[in-house]
Amino acid sequence: MDQAIGNKIADYLIKPLNPNQLLLSIKKNVHMNVIITETTTVGYQQEFSRIGMQINDSFTTDDWMEVYKKLVYWELELENNQATVSDMLQMQKKEANNAFGKFIKKNYMNWIQSPDKRPLMSPDLFKKRVFPILEKGEKLFFILIDNFRLDQWREVKDLLAEYFTFDESLYYSILPTATQYARNSIFSGLMPSQIEKMFPDLWVDEESEEGKNLNEAPLIRTQIERFRKKWTFSYNKVHDSQYGEKLLTTIPSLMQYQLNVIVLNFVDMLSHARTENKMIRELAQSEAAYRSLTRSCHLQIRLQSSEYFVRVMCHSKKIYVLFWN
């Protein structure tokens, strides 16, 4: 039996053989894709009206998070499905986007003016998610994957399941969501206008040709100091595979720090290449193809770094991975 399973058998039958077992095995291996497609299609058609009602009845930030997660779930379930059902989903996503835009327009200024009453947002991540873990004396890797969507995370999650357990939650980005604003807000714990006022030497204006995210490490330091902590930290930004391979070899030395911040830009670079590079554009013509390409990139990273993941887990109880879009 072990040898058969090791050779990736499709199924097995045990004597005495029941005719229904034989029929089930044949259907499973010959018609499985058709059955799954039909079942998924019927499932979404039944859910369509409920999701529409949920969109209309979404009045809180938690409501909208649930809508988003449900739409992402069905997008992944239907990615290989017939065009008619996929068109229904795209129409529903557009409806949700329009309604969500109105929700943000109505509430955003209140969130800015009343930080204690708003949902978890970019400036709050370190204060509410990172610092409490450091307060317990645990070492922490904070990995920020730029321009990484929830549907892409769902596509690659199983690649990391061997090494991590997951505690997932969503947060709301500030506006604009552009890197120079939202990512600086995460690392500083401040709104962009506050960064400009409190640390003018670390803020780069929109019109400037200088890189807008060159001061992320100093911004992290200012946030730690503002909370009167003395935690040690490292900061690394991975732009290419060569730097990534070099970083992996330094994992043991990073264990001396209480906080290690790693920014991964490859998904963002892939996103830009999707519009600027003809070959990448052809490889990722659809959202499903784009997710598949993202998975391939993550798989390559996983193969290169499996040994170092084990080393990290031996020294750190928790690793937070922030998916930022």
Describe these PLM feature segments.
Residues 1-11, 24:
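Alpha4 helix (beta4-alpha4-beta5 surface) of REC/receiver domains from two-component response regulators
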Residues 17-26:
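C-terminal output helix
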Residues 27-40:
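The C-terminal output helix
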Residues 46-51, 113-136, 150-239:
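Active-site nucleophile/metal-coordination loop of metallo-enzymes that catalyze phosphate/sulfate
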Residues 59-109:
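Low-complexity, highly charged intrinsically disordered N-terminal segments
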Residues 137-156, 186, 259-264, 293-319, ...:
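Beta-strand elements within well-structured catalytic alpha/beta cores of enzymes
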Residues 257, 261-292:
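Active-site His/acidic residue clusters
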